[in-house]
Curated annotation (Swiss-Prot):
<keyword id="KW-0067">ATP-binding</keyword>
<keyword id="KW-0963">Cytoplasm</keyword>
<dbReference type="InterPro" id="IPR043129">
    <property type="entry name" value="ATPase_NBD"/>
</dbReference>
<dbReference type="GO" id="GO:0044183">
    <property type="term" value="F:protein folding chaperone"/>
</dbReference>
<dbReference type="GO" id="GO:0005829">
    <property type="term" value="C:cytosol"/>
</dbReference>
<dbReference type="InterPro" id="IPR029047">
    <property type="entry name" value="HSP70_peptide-bd_sf"/>
</dbReference>
<feature type="compositionally biased region" description="Polar residues">
    <location>
        <begin position="625"/>
        <end position="634"/>
    </location>
</feature>
<dbReference type="GO" id="GO:0005737">
    <property type="term" value="C:cytoplasm"/>
</dbReference>
<comment type="function">
    <text>Affects actin polymerization through interaction with the actin-binding protein CAP32/34 (acpA/acpB). Acts as a chaperone by stimulating the refolding of denaturated acpA and acpB, but neither stimulates nor inhibits the capping activity of native CAP32/34.</text>
</comment>
<feature type="region of interest" description="Disordered">
    <location>
        <begin position="609"/>
        <end position="640"/>
    </location>
</feature>
<protein>
    <recommendedName>
        <fullName>Heat shock cognate 70 kDa protein 1</fullName>
    </recommendedName>
</protein>
<dbReference type="GO" id="GO:0051015">
    <property type="term" value="F:actin filament binding"/>
</dbReference>
<dbReference type="GO" id="GO:0042026">
    <property type="term" value="P:protein refolding"/>
</dbReference>
<dbReference type="InterPro" id="IPR018181">
    <property type="entry name" value="Heat_shock_70_CS"/>
</dbReference>
<dbReference type="Pfam" id="PF00012">
    <property type="entry name" value="HSP70"/>
</dbReference>
<dbReference type="GO" id="GO:0051085">
    <property type="term" value="P:chaperone cofactor-dependent protein refolding"/>
</dbReference>
<dbReference type="GO" id="GO:0140662">
    <property type="term" value="F:ATP-dependent protein folding chaperone"/>
</dbReference>
């Protein structure tokens, strides 16, 4: 069974598969090897990827992106609250404190969870792979930032389930990138590799050792909330201020203007990676005012100076955590599109005392590449080339439970290699205590109130005894996906309780996932129907125009009687008029119109053929013979 590797990115996603003894990164239907993580909803259809991103300025409130910045988070998170200020689409709390996205779709208000939006992007990646491989794909390895916590990982897995993918493994993005790097560089002793991954929305630094195909993550740090979009935001704010200064007008209230400016800023940022200056030219940006301006690389670097410098903090942290100094790093590998920014490269190189950075792997594709290798290993497909690779990943955050006085007692410290299992014995706090409440947290702070509650459960039925006598054995078990199971057992009675950390944190229940899978299937069918509808419409339109033009051909005009000519003219004219006012008719309406038009046209055309009035091979669609008007359906997809 083929399995694919998917890099589900904040701004762009990428898919790869192991084939012919190597990884192939698969281009989408637009020929692009990365696909925007965008989903758009219009009056007539749902668009995913390039098509969604290309119409964002016309439809900002119903075009959803950055779902990765919402997935597995709470609505009240301060990051979510601050992001919402930048998003043109509407985010609302639902089911307690879960963020959901509200859009208008086919004239109705719809509400989607971040998992559902991400599942639509995953579906697009799945379909891209299926179109290339010519078969159905069910299995995938999906990557997440190393710093994603338990709920963000679980929610990503749920998104896979909704898109009908069996998620074989969730792996960390920097680990995947290290595989991409390591596969190219096998052998040659133990190496310490620093992976510096700065993408569109997240930033990860990981330190790994690679030796004889064993990848061991020593430490990981980062910011789930720093990336190319934050640099875009700085540019947007800069130009909004400039527009205010020049024209005394604030464009912030106009979403379309802001969106057009953001697109121009993203383009300028990319230009500045290779040029010292970039110009921005936007016609009629706001209230008819053209906005022509430029920005230098130096100015851009100044606008983002604190963000760029901040990229070094996690680098220092992983060195400290893995107890290594800068000199003992053998390779610094750049991953993520934002590592193309010269200033970022310069700061990193200076930090490592001028050491050359490794740019041998494609920063946009490395993560999907590594995920595809891992997918091949898990489905026993990669053969000898990958068989001896072993991935030892780590838990990004400490996990433990609350003990008396709200103290965090850690069972699994962060950067512990996973999968792993730890057991510790606890007791009661007061005499004759009938039960204990096991509250599971993740985080690095001393008090649980400052950490993140993962879930809780009660172990009851403890026989009366003085405090400190009962023995409750608590086991933390982290699987290879970084997902935690906790169990507690009262040693005197053998009474046992356990919890898989899933739903307590605004996670999706099994029922919700099943409902979302069904919804996803429904949307997919609607997408198919929409495609069929558009094809029938285009077919009718092409046919009408071809017929209309064919009677203007001199040879035909000479042979055709005036009455036949006017019949054809009036029929095609009325069909074209009807088409103008019925752009959203159903497929069978278009087909009926087609049949009716053919019924009028065919007898006239076959009469011409018999009289030899038709030019050979091509006056009519496909050089029609009298019984095959349908040869007009050699389909050419037209672009609007």
């Amino acid at each position: 069974m083929s399995s694919i590797g998917i890099d589900l990115g904040t701004t762009y996603s990428c898919v790869g598969v192991w084939q012919n003894d190597r990884v192939e990164i698969i281009a989408n239907d637009q020929g692009n090897r990365t696909t925007p993580s965008y989903v758009a909803f219009t009056d007539t259809e749902r668009l995913i990827g390039d098509a969604a991103k290309n119409q964002v300025a016309m439809n900002p409130t119903n075009t959803v992106f950055d779902a990765k910045r919402l997935i597995g988070r709470k609505f009240s998170d301060k990051e979510v609250q601050s992001d919402m200020k930048h998003w043109p689409f509407k985010v609302i709390p639902k089911d307690g404190d879960k963020p959901h996205i509200q859009v208008e779709f086919k004239g109705e208000t719809k509400v989607f969870s971040p998992e559902e939006i991400s599942s639509m992007v995953l579906l697009k990646m799945k379909e891209t792979a299926e179109a290339y491989l010519g078969k159905t794909i069910n299995n995938a390895v999906i990557t997440v930032p190393a710093y994603f916590n338990d709920s963000q990982r679980q929610a990503t897995k749920d998104a896979g389930t909704i898109s009908k993918l069996n998620v074989q493994r969730i792996i960390n993005e920097p680990t995947a990138a290290a595989i991409a790097y390591g596969l190219e560089k096998k052998g040659s002793g133990e190496k310490n590799i620093l992976i510096f991954d700065l993408g569109g929305g997240t930033f990860d630094v990981s330190l790994l050792t690679i030796e004889d195909g064993v990848f061991e993550v020593k430490a990981t740090a980062g910011d789930t909330h720093l990336g190319g979009e934050d640099f875009d935001n700085r540019l947007v704010s800069h130009f909004v201020d400039e527009f205010k200064r020049k024209h005394k007008k604030d464009i912030m209230g106009n979403q379309r203007a802001v969106r057009r400016l953001r697109t121009a800023c993203e383009r300028a940022k990319r230009t500045l990676s290779s040029s010292a200056q970039a110009s921005i030219e936007i016609d009629s940006l706001f209230e008819g005012i053209d906005f022509y301006t430029s920005i230098t690389r130096a100015r851009f670097e100044e606008l983002c100076a604190d963000l760029f410098r901040g990229c070094l903090d996690p680098v220092e942290k992983v060195l400290k955590d893995s107890k290594l100094d800068k000199k003992s790093i053998h390779e610094i590998v750049l991953v993520g599109g934002s590592t193309r920014i010269p200033k970022v490269q310069q700061l990193l190189q200076e930090f490592f005392n001028g050491k050359e950075l490794n740019k041998s792997i494609n920063p946009d594709e490395a993560v999907a590449y590594g995920a595809a290798v891992q997918a091949a290993i898990l489905s026993n497909e990669g053969g000898a080339k990958v068989a001896d690779l072993l991935l030892l990943d780590v838990a990004p955050l400490s996990m433990g439970l609350e003990t008396a006085g709200g103290v965090m007692t850690t069972l699994i410290p962060r950067n512990t290699t996973i999968p792993c299992k730890k057991t510790q014995t606890f007791s009661t706090y007061s005499d004759n205590q009938p039960g204990v409440l096991i509250q599971v947290y993740e985080g690095e702070r001393a008090m649980t109130k400052d950490n993140n509650l993962l879930g809780k459960f009660e172990l009851s039925g403890i026989p009366p005894a003085p405090r400190g006598v009962p023995q409750v054995e608590v086991t933390f078990d982290v699987d290879a996906n970084g997902i935690l199971n906790v169990s507690a057992e009262d040693k005197s009675t053998g009474n046992k309780q356990k919890i898989t950390i899933t739903n307590d944190k605004g996670r999706l229940s099994k029922e919700e996932i099943e409902k979302m899978v069904a919804d996803a299937e429904k949307f997919k069918q609607q997408d198919e129907q929409q495609k069929d509808r558009v094809e029938s419409k285009n077919k009718l339109e092409n046919y009408a125009f071809t017929v209309k033009n064919s009677i203007k051909d001199e040879k035909v005009a000479a042979k055709i009687s005036d009455s036949d000519k006017s019949t054809i003219e009036s029929e095609t004219e009325s069909v074209l008029k009807w088409l103008e006012s019925n752009q959203t008719a159903e497929k069978d309406e278009y087909e009926d119109k087609m049949k009716a038009l053919e019924a009028v046209v065919n007898p006239i055309m076959s009469k011409l053929y018999q009289e030899g009035g038709m030019p050979q091979g091509g006056g009519m669609p496909g050089g029609m013979s009298n019984d095959s008007p349908k040869s007009s359906n050699n389909k050419v997809d037209e672009l609007d």
